[in-house]
């Protein structure tokens, strides 16, 4: 099933836009409103799964926290394992970490050292692509463990914030269901 314009418009309309959140001048795209609509949520999972069903994916990696909500169902539908990438000290086994830049400062993401095997073909899934910092760090973690990142898939792409270009410089193709301008 290829996504139709009508299906993509339905998804786009299920995402609420909140003005001045989390601070004045920001137009926040709230993917949780899509989650509240079972038809939209199921459709988003179905479209992502359909795109990657014959890609030979061996693991799906989701970034904390909303990436879990989309990545885990896609992994289940593809019949492959799901790997969470989390903030520091949230994973119980041995981990490796990667730092990334925030608007004011830095943060870190971690992954279990045994979650990705050399040669794993990985699909990274998150709810939204903005500047690409989180996914950049996630890709670096996967590669450090010997995994090959096949694609990065998103529900929303804030296309004018530079995330897609940043990931392309890493050799990562981005796929998203719903484009929005970023603010």
Swiss-Prot record:
Highest taxon of source: Bacteria
The keyword Transferase belongs to this UniProt entry's keyword annotation: yes
Top enzyme category: transferase
Enzymatic reactions: AMP + diphosphate = 5-phospho-alpha-D-ribose 1-diphosphate + adenine
E.C. number(s) listed in UniProt: 2.4.2.7
An annotated GO cellular component: cytosol
Pathway annotation: Purine metabolism; AMP biosynthesis via salvage pathway; AMP from adenine: step 1/1
Subcellular location: Cytoplasm
Entry keyword set: Cytoplasm, Glycosyltransferase, Purine salvage, Transferase
InterPro entries the record matches: Ade_phspho_trans (IPR005764), Adenine_PRTase (IPR050120), PRibTrfase_dom (IPR000836), PRTase-like (IPR029057)
Function: Catalyzes a salvage reaction resulting in the formation of AMP, that is energically less costly than de novo synthesis.
HAMAP family, per the entry: Aden_phosphoribosyltr
PANTHER family from the UniProt entry: ADENINE PHOSPHORIBOSYLTRANSFERASE, PHOSPHORIBOSYLTRANSFERASE DOMAIN-CONTAINING PROTEIN
Similarity section: Belongs to the purine/pyrimidine phosphoribosyltransferase family.
NCBIfam families: apt, PRK02304.1-1, PRK02304.1-2, PRK02304.1-3, PRK02304.1-5
Complex formation: Homodimer.
Name of the protein: Adenine phosphoribosyltransferase
Organism: Klebsiella pneumoniae (strain 342)
């Amino acid at each position: 099933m290829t996504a139709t314009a009508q299906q993509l418009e339905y998804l786009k309309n299920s995402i609420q836009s909140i003005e001045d959140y989390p601070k004045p001048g920001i137009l926040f795209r709230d993917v949780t409103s899509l989650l509240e609509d079972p038809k939209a949520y199921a459709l988003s999972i179905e479209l992502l799964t359909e795109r990657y069903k014959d890609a030979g994916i061996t693991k799906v990696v989701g970034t904390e926290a909303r990436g879990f909500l989309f990545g885990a169902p896609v992994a289940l539908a593809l019949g492959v394992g799901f790997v969470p990438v989390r903030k520091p000290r949230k994973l119980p086994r041995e981990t490796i970490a990667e730092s990334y830049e925030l608007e004011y400062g830095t943060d870190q993401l971690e992954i279990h050292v045994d979650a990705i095997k050399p040669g794993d073909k990985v699909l990274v899934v998150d709810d939204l692509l903005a500047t690409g910092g989180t996914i950049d760090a996630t890709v670096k973690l996967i590669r450090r463990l010997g995994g090959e990142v096949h694609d990065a898939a998103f529900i929303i792409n804030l296309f004018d914030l530079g995330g897609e270009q940043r990931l392309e410089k890493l050799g990562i193709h981005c796929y998203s269901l719903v484009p929005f301008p970023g603010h």
